[in-house]
Every structure is written in C-alpha cells, then in structure tokens.
C-alpha cells in the first residue's frame, strides 16, 4: 500500500473532526460508514494518523458486511484472530462476554503483538452493550515516548522485547486448534521479538511498542532488569495525560492505529457485551535505525 504521505490532500464534503485531546482521540462527524467511498476512506486514514483513535457515532446501519467493506477500503483485512474465532465471517472476531471461553481484555494490550506482523488498524463495532460499564481506554504510545527523558529514550531505542501469546491463548489453542494467519494455519504460538520502540512506517514517529498483555520480557537483560524497565514503561504509558476513555453507545464504531496505541476494556459489567472487530494487515515492526528481530 502506498504511504499516505505521498497522496495529495483529499476532502470529503461534510466531514468534521472533533478533537478529544491534544494528540489522542477524535470524533468524526458527517460520514456514513455504510456508504463511504475511497476518498472518504483516505480521509479516515489521514485522520487516524493524526489522532490515532477515531469514533463514529449513530452508525446504526453499520453491520458485519459494512464493517468488512470498510476494512477492505482501509487496507487488506486479516482473518479475525489467529487463535480465537467463532463467527461465520472469517474476517470478524466476535468478542462475546457470554461465551464460556471468552477472554476478557481487562489488561493493557496492543492487538496480536504475539505474531510477527501485528495488525496495523483495528475497527471495533458495538453490537450488544450492557446498560452500564464496559468502557474502553486507549493510551498514546507516541506521546508516551516523546515525554520520556532523553537517557530513557536512548536506552529504550536499543532494546528488543519478547511477545508471547501462550499466556493468554496457549490453552485455548491446544484445546480448539488455531486459524489461518498470514496464509498458514496456526498450530503453535512461538514467541516473537519486536523493538521496544517502534518507528511508525507512515509517519516516522517513535512510540513504545510493549504491552502487559503480551510482552513477556526484554531481550538480553536479567529478569530483574527486564521487570524494572517494563514496569517503568507501563506506568509511564498509562499515565492519565496519555490516555482517553470511551463510553460505548449503540451505533458506535471505533477505529484505532494499532501501531501507535494500547487499549484496555473495563471488566465492570455483568450483562452481556458483544463487540465485532476486524483488523487491517500490518507489517513487521521496525525500530530506531532499522532495529528489528534477528
């Protein structure tokens, strides 16, 4: 896919961006996601690079077909999930709290970083909502990196970290088997390395690319050093100044840049909560000066 920076600006009539914070989060008005064209999709991607998390309200006609269509306009869709999968549409990950094997997302994480090429973009649609609770928060990994001290940036820039999906999905995979991902059926989840600081492939900005959900340790250092570095980065990443919180309403759709954010879904409800997610294919994370897993 051609980088957005090489495109001339485009404008969708009626589109209005309502910022939610200095750098993170925006509500997009004036777009019906059920009938967008390539120009509107370009504008969404451009807004996503600037604001990292976008919300669209009152999209009541936005169904599974429309969600898949939107995803394909934004890039190439992945299958719904490399391990979990209980929806008739292969592109959709059905997140249903009534499923006895449902995995709660009440830990800060970035989607599917335990694979070599995590998704670039995630699109989440509210299907069934509890009367209260179930909010989602996002953290801005680029703002978090920018606000680190220079010595800590220099340290983080040269580190690799291991991401391991077995802690969350290993037992599920062993019991149920995996699904297609990157053209192959997933039968095991070997740990992968990613740079601790990721350089965004479209903007060139640096951001922290570790998360408590899937990052197990920093490579090449002692366990104590790894724990100290990760704990410090997690605490810094999730400071209130780097986060926003969204209370879902019927008809809401959220889109986020999975290369520049982490998120957390509150586990504070007892009624059923169902969300449908699709993800746009990403690339292999690269760090500062091209740092990558060996």
Identify the residue ranges that each predicted region occupies.
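Non-heme Fe(II) oxygenase catalytic core, chiefly the N-lobe of the double-stranded beta-helix
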Residues: 2-253, 258-294
């Amino acid at each position: 896919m051609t980088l957005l920076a090489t495109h001339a600006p485009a404008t969708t009539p009626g589109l209005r961006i309502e910022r939610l914070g200095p750098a993170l989060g925006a509500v997009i008005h004036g777009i019906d996601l059920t009938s967008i064209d390539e120009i509107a999709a370009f504008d969404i991607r451009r807004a996503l690079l600037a604001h990292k998390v976008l919300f669209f309200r009152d999209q009541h006609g936005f169904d599974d077909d429309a969600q898949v269509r939107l995803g394909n306009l934004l890039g190439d869709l992945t299958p719904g999930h490399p391990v979990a999968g209980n929806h008739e549409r292969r592109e959709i990950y059905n997140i249903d709290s009534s499923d006895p094997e449902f995995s709660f997302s009440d830990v800060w994480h970035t989607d599917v970083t335990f694979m070599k090429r995590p998704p670039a973009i995630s699109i989440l649609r509210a299907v069934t909502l509890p009367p209260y609770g179930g909010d989602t928060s996002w953290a801005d990994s680029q703002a978090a990196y920018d606000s680190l001290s220079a010595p800590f940036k220099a340290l983080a820039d040269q580190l690799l970290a291991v991401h391991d999906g077995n802690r969350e999905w290993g037992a599920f995979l062993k019991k149920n088997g995996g699904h297609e991902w990157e053209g192959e059926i997933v039968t095991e989840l070997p740990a992968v390395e990613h740079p601790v600081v990721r350089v965004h492939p479209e903007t060139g900005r640096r951001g922290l690319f570790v998360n408590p959900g899937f990052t197990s340790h920093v490579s090449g250092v002692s366990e104590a050093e790894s724990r100290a570095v990760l704990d410090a980065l997690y605490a810094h990443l999730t400071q209130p100044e780097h986060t926003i919180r969204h209370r879902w309403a019927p008809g809401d759709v959220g889109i986020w840049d999975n290369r520049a954010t982490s998120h957390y879904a509150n586990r504070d409800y007892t009624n059923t909560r169902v969300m449908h997610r699709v993800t746009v294919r990403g690339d292999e994370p690269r760090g500062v000066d091209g740092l990558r897993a060996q």
